Amino acid sequence: MRKMNTLLLVSLSFLYLKEVMGLKCNTCIYTEGWKCMAGRGTCIAKENELCSTTAYFRGDKHMYSTHMCKYKCREEESSKRGLLRVTLCCDRNFCNVF
């Protein structure tokens, strides 16, 4: 029983630390060729935010991407004038890699 209590306490401690520490995401204003060219950094997601990557493609060619903490992030795909925009969301530290 003591071993189980210790395991439970350790597990709860990790969950608490995750909440206190917050979700950390990569930020980049402009990524070209999967390399951050401007605004590289990190953000800590606030309530209702997730890590996000929005990538823009023309045909099969990646044009550029942005990376950020995004409020009420939704995965979506849209196309306008031949430019495809794809938004991906994730909830693990630094999951929005470039």
UniProtKB/Swiss-Prot annotation:
Tissue specificity field: Specifically expressed in prostate, testis and spinal cord. Present in the acrosomal region of sperm cells. Present in apical epithelial cells of prostatic duct.
Residue ranges annotated for the UPAR/Ly6 domain, each copy included: 23-98
GO molecular function: acetylcholine receptor regulator activity
Signal peptide: 1-22
Single Gene Ontology BP annotation: regulation of neurotransmitter receptor activity
Intrachain S-S bonds: C25-C51, C28-C36, C43-C69, C73-C89
Family: Belongs to the PATE family.
Protein name as catalogued: Prostate and testis expressed protein 4
Organism of derivation: Homo sapiens
